[in-house]
């Protein structure tokens, strides 16, 4: 099986952090916004850092939604990271009225403030 993993560049996201992480484990990442390259990819990664509404707007503007949906329905390996995963749902509390890709039924919901939120981020060790 090929070590090549195609990372979708839609103008937002942590592209180069993901690219470096994949390289560190021996993968061969390809960063692209070219629909033809994405269509031919064996494995696809949709990264994400940003706001749900802005990301969906960028995907629409870039014309990548059809090739993403075709890839998802084809059954080839597809990984959404963080916001990239959230975009696969029908919508998000973060952007009321903005439709997601709708591959998964449901909406990304905001965690209630009385729930304990897991720690995310980096800590400095000495």
Describe every region a protein language model picked out.
Residues 2-6:
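Extreme N-terminal starter segment of soluble prokaryotic enzymes
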Residues 29-31, 108:
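Generic structural signal for residues in well-ordered beta-strands
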Residues 41:
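An anion/phosphate-binding loop that grips the pyrophosphate of nucleotide cofactors and donors
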Residues 44-47, 72-90:
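Catalytic nucleophile loop
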Residues 53-62, 90-93:
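Glycine/threonine-rich flexible loop motifs
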Residues 63-74:
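Catalytic-core regions built around general acid/base machinery
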Residues 90-126:
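Pocket-forming structural segment of enzyme catalytic cores
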């Amino acid at each position: 099986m090929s070590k090549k993993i195609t990372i979708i560049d839609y103008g937002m996201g942590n592209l180069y952090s993901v690219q470096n992480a994949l390289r560190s484990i021996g993968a061969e990442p390809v960063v692209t916004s070219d629909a033809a390259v994405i269509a031919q990819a064996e494995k696809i990664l949709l990264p994400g850092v940003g706001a749900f509404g802005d990301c969906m707007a960028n995907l629409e503007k870039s014309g990548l939604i059809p090739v993403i949906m075709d890839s998802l329905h084809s059954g080839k390996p597809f990984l959404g990271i963080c916001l990239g995963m959230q975009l696969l749902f029908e919508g998000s509390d973060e952007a009321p009225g903005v439709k997601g890709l709708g591959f998964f039924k449901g909406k990304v919901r905001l965690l209630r403030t009385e729930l304990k939120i897991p720690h995310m981020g980096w800590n400095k060790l000495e």
